[in-house]
């Protein structure tokens, strides 16, 4: 049994869209909230039990709330899109006791992980995700989460 970590890019940014905002420009659009909610409902049909985390950005926190219907655990370190991110992910995985983990993060974090672990370019769209697992000693990046499966 491994801890599985799903790292999602946040919903549609309000400051880069002409769509109506859910709150202010630092958050996500109303369309972003609807898509996050739809994605969360779909996800919960496959993975009913999971813990939800978010970086400290308004857009990731809003996405996490609409995705899960719960307040996420907010961690500033989930915005560190460099080698420090691995320490944060390992810490979350160790404390999870083999539960599924969903993390709302940023496109540059996902791009960093794909480049660093797989040597691949990854330009995630809103709500695209990568899957990792923690085998008790190390983090392994499995690839892109196929939402259509």
Give short role names for the model-derived ranges.
Residues 83-95:
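...with weaker cross-activation on analogous glycine-rich loops/strands in unrelated enzymes
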Residues 1-77, 81-86, 110-111, 116-149:
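Active-site-proximal alpha-helix that buttresses catalytic centers in soluble enzyme cores
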Residues 45-47, 94-99:
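Glycine-rich phosphate-binding loop signature in dinucleotide/nucleotide-binding domains
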Residues 3-5, 96-105:
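Generic beta-sheet signal
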Residues 12-14, 93-96:
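A broad, low-specificity signal for short, low-complexity segments enriched in glycine/proline
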């Amino acid at each position: 049994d491994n801890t599985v970590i799903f790292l999602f890019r946040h919903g549609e940014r309000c400051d880069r869209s002409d769509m109506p905002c859910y709150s202010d420009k630092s958050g996500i659009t109303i369309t972003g909230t609807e898509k996050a909610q739809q994605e969360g409902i779909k996800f919960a049909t496959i993975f009913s039990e999971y813990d939800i985390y978010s970086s400290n950005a308004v857009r990731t926190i809003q996405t996490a709330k609409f995705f899960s219907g719960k307040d996420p655990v907010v961690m500033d370190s989930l915005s560190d899109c460099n080698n420090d991110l691995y320490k944060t992910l390992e810490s979350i995985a160790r404390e999870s006791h083999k539960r599924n983990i969903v993390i709302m993060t940023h496109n540059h974090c996902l791009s960093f992980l794909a480049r660093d672990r797989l040597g691949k370019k990854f330009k995630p769209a809103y709500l695209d995700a990568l899957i990792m697992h923690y085998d008790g000693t190390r983090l392994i990046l499995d690839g892109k989460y196929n939402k259509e499966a």
